[in-house]
Amino acid sequence: MRNAMIIDGKDNVAVAIEPIAKGDTVTYAANGQDVSLTAAQDIIIYHKIAIRDIPKGEPVVKYGEHIGIASQDIRTGEHVHVHNVEGHRENLEEKV
């Protein structure tokens, strides 16, 4: 049974659609097939889980959009949230 979802093939995180405990199997659909991985940490409902390793400095992609930059290496199955993602909005003052 699927307990997470991705929207776009570019996504490197899935969204938990129910609470997921450390060690649980996380299953989501990608390209018409179910994909599974093991949760490395507890994931709160509607929070993100890495579906592949995300090196420090790489964009975090959800729903096909960059939502931040990994502030540390994030391993497959880990919780992805403010503790390991930083914003990447442009600083408009620097451009003026």
Where are these regions (language model features)?
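A short, sequence-level motif marking secondary-structure junctions
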Residues: 21, 40-44, 72-76
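Hydrophobic aliphatic residue packing
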Residues: 13-15, 26, 60, 74, ...
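Extended boundary segments
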Residues: 1-39
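Loop/turn positions that initiate beta-strands
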Residues: 23, 46, 57, 77-80
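Compact, glycine-rich, soluble single-domain proteins
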Residues: 27-63, 69
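Charge-rich, low-complexity amphipathic helices
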Residues: 35-38, 42, 48, 82, ...
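C-terminal structural segments of small proteins and small subunits
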Residues: 63, 67-94
